């Protein structure tokens, strides 16, 4: 039995002028979420969704590609200005930020919202390579 083709509706354009870019850069991956000022998601992307697998997800180039993809989707909804919130210790922080700036967004502020433990949980042991 043949399956019926499912029609996927394209999301309606929201026309939002300002947004917040949340760049979450871990040691293994980089995720970019662009939301409106209230925090409702407009677009998102990650190094994994861009087709990178394994250790290639943690590269600055993968973060740049993910930021360009999320930025392109956000521009379809009319986003022009961004506040950037960077979180995490990963290598994709700066390259994702540069990619958003190169995509034509007017970046108004950059905040580092990495949570810092006040002597909380014990960190993972040091790697011996």
Swiss-Prot record:
Annotated PROSITE patterns: RIBOSOMAL_S11
InterPro entries cross-referenced by the UniProt entry: Ribosomal_uS11 (IPR001971), Ribosomal_uS11_bac-type (IPR019981), Ribosomal_uS11_CS (IPR018102), Ribosomal_uS11_sf (IPR036967)
Cystine residue pairs: none
GO biological process: translation
Domain of life where this protein originates: Bacteria
GO terms assigned for molecular function: rRNA binding; structural constituent of ribosome
Cellular component terms (Gene Ontology): ribonucleoprotein complex; ribosome
Keywords (A to Z) from UniProt: Ribonucleoprotein, Ribosomal protein, RNA-binding, rRNA-binding
Entries under HAMAP family matching the protein: Ribosomal_uS11
Description of how the protein assembles with itself and partners: Part of the 30S ribosomal subunit. Interacts with proteins S7 and S18. Binds to IF-3.
Functional description taken from the UniProt entry: Located on the platform of the 30S subunit, it bridges several disparate RNA helices of the 16S rRNA. Forms part of the Shine-Dalgarno cleft in the 70S ribosome.
Family membership noted in the UniProt record: Belongs to the universal ribosomal protein uS11 family.
Name recorded for this polypeptide: Small ribosomal subunit protein uS11
Gene expressing this chain: rpsK
